[in-house]
């Protein structure tokens, strides 16, 4: 089943309620999952107390912008996941608009393998939650599109394509907006943006929220007013990187650069030839291709950071957790996370990534990134008291402007770095499956 709802209709609350009901009825043991909650990004998964869909079900991941073909788990890996999911009652996939049709097929195939059946999704109850007018997959087609015959042959290895969404999914929706409840003006404005029909009133409202000072000044002003600092939302990674660097430089504390350690499968760096080092150099600013670990991590006491991997899910040290650096030491970084009462020490981790066809690199680094600014894709599903948003025409893709604006609870919490009149011409919306 697919449960739809615009941003703010308490889809996350519904997910939490279902999990509580499952736990109350069946009482899962420690380490056992009966209600599997997953999402396409770390922050979205953290927001609903789940894991990324790729992590839990060990799905094929992207390499250089392309998703690899489906592969079966090793016997040992399949045994472990079967033990974890042996009493699974329901799977909930949140933020389904960002799940591609190919990953939907991979999920079905993985569940077939785990539970030894050719029934859809391993014959397990599967609930998809989200808004298909929000962000589509970064790479790939939306879940409701039929997979092309070419992809079916090259990635899945079968002859004919099937529209899994059309074959399996029923539809219902949530209709009451709780996030912007009581702010009717903001709600109407969001609705017009969602459907790509910006009224003159909406445009005037947006223009009135553009600030004139520098982003550093505005950030510090908002930081002094609220309990948690604001988040800056941009459409492109390069813009986020620039803002993160500007905010780090604006701190009065000493900036410290922490380099990674890269080794090959044998544990040696001596074998890296000139070509290999050149390839690694090209990935310096692309941590998404290096297992989420930075080549050089620049930090300072007082800077905002986000955790990039799960350290201890029982205390909330999970991929997507946000906090402030309290101390930087040789082997650890002390961080006060927003949702944890006491500072936590984060140590270096080692992750493996493929550099070329026959070469895997093991990288050791602190699993952190600066977190003043983030791409809109990464934060879909959050609810924010305050946000600084760039609404220039570089906002690209279906639903991106709407998603960014709808994350904010009230109009007073909305602060725009820019607004381009041409935005009215470039906002487009997916109109299928709106109910």
Show the residue positions of the predicted features.
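Conserved ATP-binding/catalytic motifs of P-loop helicase motor domains
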Residues: 1-435
């Amino acid at each position: 089943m697919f449960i739809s709802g615009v941003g703010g209709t308490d889809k996350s609350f519904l997910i939490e309620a279902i999990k509580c009901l499952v736990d109350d009825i069946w009482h899962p043991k420690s380490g056992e999952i009966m209600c599997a909650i997953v999402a396409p990004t770390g922050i979205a998964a953290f927001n609903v107390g789940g894991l990324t869909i790729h992590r839990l079900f060990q799905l094929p991941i992207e390499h250089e912008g392309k998703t690899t073909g489906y592969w079966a788990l090793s016997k040992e890996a399949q045994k472990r996941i079967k033990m974890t999911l042996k009493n699974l009652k329901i799977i909930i996939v949140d933020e389904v608009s960002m799940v591609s049709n190919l990953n939907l097929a991979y999920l079905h195939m993985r569940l077939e393998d785990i539970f030894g059946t050719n029934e859809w999704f391993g014959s397990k109850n599967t609930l998809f939650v989200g808004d298909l007018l929000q962000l589509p997959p970064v790479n790939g087609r939306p879940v409701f599109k039929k997979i092309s015959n070419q992809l079916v042959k090259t990635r899945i290895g079968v002859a004919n394509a099937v529209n899994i969404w059309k074959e399996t999914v029923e539809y219902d929706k949530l209709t009451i907006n709780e996030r912007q409840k009581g702010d009717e003006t903001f709600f109407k404005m969001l609705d017009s943006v969602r459907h790509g029909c910006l009224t003159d009133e909406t445009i005037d409202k947006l223009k009135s929220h553009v600030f004139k000072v520098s982003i550093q000044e505005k950030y510090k002003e908002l930081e002094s007013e609220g309990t948690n600092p604001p988040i800056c939302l941009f459409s492109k990674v390069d813009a986020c990187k620039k803002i993160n660097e500007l905010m780090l430089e604006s701190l009065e504390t000493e900036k410290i650069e922490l380099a990674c350690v890269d080794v090959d499968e044998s544990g040696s760096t001596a074998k890296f030839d000139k070509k290999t080092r050149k390839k690694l150099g090209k990935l310096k600013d692309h941590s998404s291709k290096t297992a989420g670990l930075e080549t050089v991590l620049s930090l300072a006491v007082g800077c905002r950071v986000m955790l990039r991997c799960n350290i201890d899910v029982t205390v909330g040290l999970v991929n997507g957790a946000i906090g402030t650096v309290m101390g930087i030491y040789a082997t650890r970084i002390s961080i006060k996370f927003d949702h944890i009462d006491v500072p936590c020490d984060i140590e270096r981790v080692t992750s493996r990534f493929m550099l070329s066809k026959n070469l895997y690199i093991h990288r050791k680094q602190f699993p952190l990134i600066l977190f003043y600014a983030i791409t809109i894709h990464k934060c879909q599903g959050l609810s924010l008291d305050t946000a600084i948003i760039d609404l220039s025409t570089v906002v690209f893709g279906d639903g991106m402007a709407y998603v960014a604006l709808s994350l904010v609870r009230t109009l007073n919490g909305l602060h725009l770095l820019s607004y381009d009149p041409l935005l009215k011409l470039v906002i487009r919306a997916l109109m299928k499956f709106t109910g």
